[in-house]
């Protein structure tokens, strides 16, 4: 039987397609892996088994833990990335990515052990991606965790050229008996506030709207640096000073001040019937937040539920331990203030109020 003949095809004699023709450059991906290996190597710590490049990353829970509980967190950098694209500034968003997850797992008493990242783009720019990952590795060094693996996804047509998205994943461990969950917080306890380094990584949709309205010169001097650098200051990582504090002080609760600001994050560690009363005079409002409020016409209540307003981490300790905690944190290089007290809630009252 004669086999059917295929229809004439104008591409029969044309050169065959490659993955690069479709927009995916395998060689660029390989070049990125080679570029970032030295950064990842600097983050290695006890527990890491093997190197980068395997199908899965291996980590052995440190033997110092008798009843280890694993604590995981994941987050991104949000629309702060849009400002990074506008400014062509990619060296700080990697630290932002790490900070958002390691600070989250820290509040339950966990020591960050390892971190993985996800970098997605339409067309891979090796230089830009390497700069981002270098920042991720720096964040891992600051938090004492290993950059143990990650994924770079080049997806043509999904993102405009020059743009990318990030996601990060942190895993830590805490002794089961030392989990911090806020259950011991009681009236009379003191709320300490640790200074933020700036806006951190939340509220940037409003920040960008304010910039759009005010049309400032982002290169102009602002409090000793450019306004652009002030806006893009990387999220502070609190891991090492707070882990050290936990070795000496009974920390009752912590809240990473992210989306929702002080008034929505502190209640996450308070049991029903308790309110954190914060005194707005208890800490200085950094100039950048005053600038945002002025140029955006943002109400005080909105500022407190969108931005960290200068406090990146809240720590609850007993009144008897407050001064010692401040001394230890200050000695570790942190700026810290007594910003409030815990009391019983009035009927129908919110669990965090700023007075």
Curated annotation (Swiss-Prot):
Cite the GO molecular-function annotations of the record.
ATP binding; phosphoribosylamine-glycine ligase activity; phosphoribosylformylglycinamidine cyclo-ligase activity
- Electron transport as a keyword of this entry, yes or no, is no
Q: What EC number(s) does its UniProt record assign?
A: 6.3.3.1
Q: Which domain of life is it from?
A: Bacteria
Top-level EC class as recorded in UniProt: ligase
Q: Which GO terms describe its cellular component?
A: cytosol
Q: Identify the InterPro entries for this entry.
A: PurM-like_C_dom, PurM-like_C_sf, PurM-like_N, PurM-like_N_sf, PurM_cligase
Keywords for this protein: ATP-binding, Cytoplasm, Ligase, Nucleotide-binding, Purine biosynthesis
Give the record's pathway. Purine metabolism; IMP biosynthesis via de novo pathway; 5-amino-1-(5-phospho-D-ribosyl)imidazole from N(2)-formyl-N(1)-(5-phospho-D-ribosyl)glycinamide: step 2/2
Q: What is its main location?
A: cytoplasm
Q: Which Pfam families does UniProt cross-reference here? A: AIRS, AIRS_C
Q: Which SUPFAM superfamilies match?
A: PurM C-terminal domain-like (SSF56042), PurM N-terminal domain-like (SSF55326)
User: Is Cell membrane given among the entry's keywords?
Assistant: no
One of its GO biological process terms is:
adenine biosynthetic process
Give the catalytic activity: 2-formamido-N(1)-(5-O-phospho-beta-D-ribosyl)acetamidine + ATP = 5-amino-1-(5-phospho-beta-D-ribosyl)imidazole + ADP + phosphate + H(+)
Q: Where in the cell is it found?
A: Cytoplasm
Q: Tell me its family.
A: Belongs to the AIR synthase family.
Please report the name of this protein according to its UniProt entry: Phosphoribosylformylglycinamidine cyclo-ligase
Organism lineage string: Bacteria, Pseudomonadati, Pseudomonadota, Betaproteobacteria, Burkholderiales
């Amino acid at each position: 039987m004669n086999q059917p003949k295929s229809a004439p095809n104008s591409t029969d004699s044309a050169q065959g397609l490659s993955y690069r023709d479709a927009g995916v450059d395998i060689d660029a991906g390989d070049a990125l892996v080679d570029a970032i290996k030295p950064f990842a190597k600097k983050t290695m710590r006890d527990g890491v088994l093997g190197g980068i490049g395997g199908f899965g990353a291996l980590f052995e829970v440190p033997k110092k833990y008798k009843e280890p509980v694993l604590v995981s967190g994941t987050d991104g950098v949000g629309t702060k990335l849009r400002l990074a694209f506008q400014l062509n500034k990619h060296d700080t968003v990697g630290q932002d990515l790490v900070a958002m997850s390691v600070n989250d797992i820290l509040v339950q008493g966990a020591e960050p052990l390892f971190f993985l990242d996800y970098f997605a783009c339409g067309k891979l720019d090796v230089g830009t991606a390497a700069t981002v990952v270098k920042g991720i590795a720096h964040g891992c060094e600051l938090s004492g965790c290993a950059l143990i693996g990650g994924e770079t996804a080049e997806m043509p047509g999904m993102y405009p050229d020059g743009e990318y998205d990030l996601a990060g994943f942190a895993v830590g461990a805490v002794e089961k008996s030392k989990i911090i969950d806020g259950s011991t917080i009681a009236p009379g306890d003191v709320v300490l506030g640790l200074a933020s380094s700036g806006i951190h990584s939340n509220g940037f949709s409003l920040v960008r709207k304010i910039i759009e309205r005010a049309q400032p010169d982002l290169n102009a001097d602002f409090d000793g640096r450019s306004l652009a650098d002030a806006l893009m200051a990387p999220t502070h990582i609190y891991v090492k000073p707070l882990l050290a504090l936990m070795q000496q002080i009974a920390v009752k609760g912590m809240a990473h001040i992210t989306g929702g600001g002080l008034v929505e994050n502190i209640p996450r560690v308070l049991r029903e019937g308790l309110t954190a009363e914060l005194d707005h005079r208890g800490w200085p409002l950094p100039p950048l937040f005053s600038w945002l409020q002025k140029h955006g016409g943002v109400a005080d209540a909105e500022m407190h539920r969108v931005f960290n307003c200068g406090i990146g981490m809240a720590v609850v300790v007993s009144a008897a331990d407050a001064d010692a905690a401040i001394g230890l944190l200050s000695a570790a290089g942190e700026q810290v203030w007594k910003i409030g007290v815990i009391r019983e809630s009035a009927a129908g009252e919110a669990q965090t109020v700023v007075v």
